[in-house]
Regions:
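Alpha-helical tetratricopeptide repeat
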Residues: 2-6, 15-173
Length: 173
């Protein structure tokens, strides 16, 4: 009986903590919509204090850093977020977003091999996002893999990304 009671209490506290994190993230999103990135970052940090494995908070903070051009802080945070959330994949789509942001940073540093590796991982976690296939196609093309580029473009088109069709018509005929 005591074990059941402890289990039920644990589940209740977990649900309450998740609801608290979601409210904090929503407040941060509202601040961000008003372009108050400082307040948004503060709220996203607060969400990580409540739940250090909140992939969504890592993604939101990283997005702000990238938009500010602060790639080194974004990369540090993404590495930590991926390391922490990989073992407890609560939200595969959000974790895949962490990989896609990191791939963008690798791309801007012209580290195409790592960019492709991160996009590969993003696709493993979320096979339904056509943008990941499109991004990987562009990186593959820049890296000289035209066949791989065209294959990824076909997948992006199949998933409904119209921009991939234009690029495919230009480079894959």
């Amino acid at each position: 009986m005591k074990i059941v009671l402890v289990f039920v209490l644990g589940v209740c506290f977990s649900i309450q903590a998740q609801q608290k994190v979601n409210k904090i993230l929503d407040k941060g999103d509202k601040k961000l919509a008003k372009l108050d990135t400082t307040a948004a970052l503060s709220l996203y940090d607060k969400a990580l204090v409540v739940d250090s494995a909140c992939a969504d908070a890592y993604a939101k903070i990283s997005d702000v850093f990238v938009s500010r051009g602060n790639y080194s802080n974004a990369m540090e945070l993404l590495n930590a977020g991926i390391r922490i959330t990989a073992d407890i994949p609560k939200d595969r789509k959000t974790i895949s977003h962490l990989y896609s942001i990191r791939s963008f940073i690798h791309f801007t540093e012209e580290n195409f091999h790592h960019a492709i590796q991160d996009l590969d991982q993003a696709i493993v976690l979320n096979t339904e996002n056509p943008n990941y296939f499109y991004m990987r196609a562009l990186v593959k093309r820049m890296n000289g893999d035209e066949k791989g580029c065209c294959k990824d473009l076909k997948k992006a088109i199949a998933l409904g990304l119209k921009a991939a069709d234009v690029y495919s018509q230009t480079y894959c005929n």
